[in-house]
Regions:
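Histidine-centered metal-chelating micro-motifs
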Residues: 49-51, 69, 85, 89-95
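A short, N-terminal "cap"/entry segment at the start of jelly-roll beta-barrel domains
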Residues: 1-36, 120-121
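Short histidine-centered beta-strand/loop micro-motifs
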Residues: 30, 49-55, 96-98, 120
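Conserved short histidine dyad/triad with adjacent acidic residue
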Residues: 25, 40-55, 89
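Ligand-binding loop in jelly-roll beta-barrel domains
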Residues: 33, 89-116
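Short acidic-glycine-tyrosine-enriched beta hairpin
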Residues: 75-89
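Glycine-centered loop/turn positions within well-structured domains
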Residues: 58, 77, 93
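Short, conserved beta-strand element in jelly-roll/cupin
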Residues: 43-45, 54-70, 110-112
Length: 121
């Protein structure tokens, strides 16, 4: 169980060849008693992107601020604050910050526990 504020959770710089200019926070996870889902907040800087990948579990994405694209199985869709995506099992996907103003692309991403990459806990 948890009741908290996102500002009190550590922002982790995700270092990988698959990511560029991405930071994340784990908001809800098994560490606070969630045994089914993990909720993460990602911040993607200008020119940054998440990994271009697929996996055997669904993703739920909600964009909080910024501009970018979500690519789903090779098709790009524009995203902005209020945009959301359901990414089914096996769908190749990537989020990219396309802004030229320096604004962050911030989004919430919810996955099953087995889909969490294990940072920031």
């Amino acid at each position: 169980m948890i009741a908290a504020n996102v500002k009190d959770i550590k922002l982790v710089d995700l270092q990988s060849d698959a990511y560029k200019n991405v930071k994340g926070k784990v908001l809800i996870s098994p560490a606070c008693g969630s045994d089914e889902m993990v909720l993460r907040l990602f911040e993607v800087g200008q020119g940054g992107y998440s990994a271009d990948h697929s996996h055997d579990f669904p993703h739920y994405v909600y964009v909080l601020e910024g501009d970018g694209t979500v690519e789903l199985d090779g098709k790009k869709y524009p995203v902005e604050a209020g945009s959301f995506s359901f990414i089914p099992n096996g769908t190749k996907h990537q989020l990219v910050n396309t802004t030229t103003t320096g604004k962050m692309l911030k989004f919430l991403c919810m996955v099953p526990v087995e889909g969490h990459i294990g940072f920031g806990e």
